[in-house]
Regions:
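Formylglycine-dependent sulfatase
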Residues: 1-140
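Single conserved hydrophobic/aromatic residue that forms the stacking wall/gate
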Residues: 135-137, 141-155
Length: 155
């Protein structure tokens, strides 16, 4: 059987927001079970407190000033390889689900699978947005720190 890697990364989650780190009020049984069966880090460091650059470092192993993604909405350099590309170069299929944020577009991404990842298992936020109903799409697009979100009429 081929070895498999499953890498889960939550977005904007402090340590005290997950039960496995000791907060009895946070009910996160699935994350707690994964932490029990996998690797749970006690200390963390981010090279950049902004989503895109932080993700670029995690997925490339290089600092943002080296890979070109020094802020959100700026793509990494074309010659920069992600872990998915490196793994696929070695015969390991790679899929991705979630907020990509490495293509230089807006929050939702382009919906296009980058080189080295399996397009059958590629689902970024743009793909998610395209599946939403118009009410939910409007709510998601309008939710920001600057504007008020409206609840869908079906809620």
């Amino acid at each position: 059987m081929k070895k498999q890697i499953v890498f889960l990364m939550t977005d904007t989650t402090r340590k005290d927001m997950v039960g496995c780190y000791g907060n009895p009020k946070m009910k996160t049984p699935n994350l707690d079970r994964l932490a029990e069966e996998g690797i749970r880090y006690e200390n963390a460091y981010t090279c950049q407190p902004v989503c895109g650059p932080a993700r670029s470092a995690i997925f490339t192993g290089t600092f943002p000033h080296s890979n070109g993604m020094v802020t959100n909405s700026i793509a990494m350099g074309a010659n920069v390889k992600t872990v998915g590309q490196r793994l696929s170069d070695n015969g390991i299929e790679c899929g991705y689900i979630g907020k990509w944020h490495l293509d230089g577009s807006d929050y939702f991404g382009t919906g296009e699978c980058p080189e080295g990842w399996n397009p059958d298992y590629w689902y970024d936020m743009k793909c998610y947005l395209e599946e939403l109903s118009e009410d939910r799409k409007s709510t998601r697009l309008n939710s920001s720190h600057r504007s008020q979100s409206r609840m869908p009429s079906s809620a």
